[in-house]
Amino acid sequence: MLSLACFFSFLLMVKSSPLTFQERMLLKALGLNTRPNPIAPGPVPKSLRDIFEKGINKDNPCMMEGFGVPGNIVRSYRDQGPVAAMEEPQESLCLKKFLFFDLSAVENKEQLTLGQLEIKFKHNSYYGQQFHLRLYRTLQLSLKGMRESKMNRKLLVSQSFRLLHKSLYFNLTKVAKDWKTPEKNMGLLLEIYASSKLAGDNRSFAVCEPIQSFIYTSLLTVSLDPSSCKTPRAKRSTHSSPPTPSNICKKRRLYIDFKDVGWQNWVIAPRGYMANYCYGECPYPLTEMLRGTNHAVLQTLVHSVEPESTPLPCCAPTKLSPISMLYYDNNDNVVLRHYEDMVVDECGCK
């Protein structure tokens, strides 16, 4: 199978052409059905930035250490639900809002290991008033014009809090796992009450205003794609290789700038990376430095006897390493994903 680094090398040559078969294959490997074109992208969560900047643990690339769960894909979904109309005034009720997160981007092969809801308030939040939060899972949608029934929802969280300069987080892993099946995703209902009774419209507005103008709610998921997890290989000795002639098979430097392949609009970070490539001859006899396979050694031997009927082995990657990419997907969600086989570390004859 060709490495993703090889696909990028090809894209540099065809960057001015329409979406190619090779680019479609690469996008598919990245979990995308077409090249994203963010319309109204949301902010990049600090947790995803922190994981990206920390880098991959090469000894355990399929563990999200920041969350303490297995995984190699992190997604952040923005809430798509509306503020609910209050059917009748309810004493001390500040906010009633439906929450909906579209998890259709999670593939069937992925194992969802974490679902975490974040509710973030503005930084000028009011400190003194205590509030009470109730979070329900919607089990069945009410028909238009009909009064909402409490039988159609299940209480998940009930807790009191004060507005501080920080977010509220709730573990919704079990619910998020169910939402991998779209028919089971009816969303959530969020209600926030002032703990004390509100007297008068002015006091009601003063107390509830920080709640009614919270910045956003988002859902973060961590999932594991087992097909992208590789067992770490034993480290080779670190002695440096002697200089080789320029025409001999070896690693060559290649920097991939995502702007050169037309991906700068949706790839958040990195802006580019050192992908490298393999190029050169595999002459007879193969030396240990060329890291030839047993098949390649025999092939060069046969080539030395019958050069017209048997070609020389090819110069190809023998060791590849992963990178992390932070980008917007086709639904404007922020995704952090670890990708195998993105950097050529060593070359040999195959």
From Swiss-Prot:
CDD domains, per the entry: TGF_beta_GDF1_3_like (cd13764)
UniProt key word Secreted: yes
Record GO terms (molecular function): cytokine activity; growth factor activity; morphogen activity; protein homodimerization activity
Major localization listed first in the record, in broad terms: secreted
Subcellular location, record wording: Secreted
Signal peptide: 1-16
InterPro entries: Cystine-knot_cytokine, TGF-b_C, TGF-b_propeptide, TGF-beta-rel, TGFb_CS
GO-annotated biological processes: anterior/posterior pattern specification; determination of left/right symmetry; mesoderm formation
GO cellular component, one term: extracellular region
Keyword Cytoplasm among record annotations: no
Residue ranges annotated as propeptide in the record: 17-236
Function comment: Required for posterior mesoderm formation during embryogenesis. Acts indirectly to suppress head formation by altering mesodermal patterning. Also involved in the establishment of left-right axis asymmetry, acting upstream of nodal/nr-1. Can exert long-range effects in the embryo.
Subunit-structure text: Homodimer; disulfide-linked. Also forms heterodimers with other TGF-beta family members including nodal2/nr-2 and bmp4.
Family membership noted in the UniProt record: Belongs to the TGF-beta family.
Protein name per UniProt: Derriere protein
Underlying gene: derriere
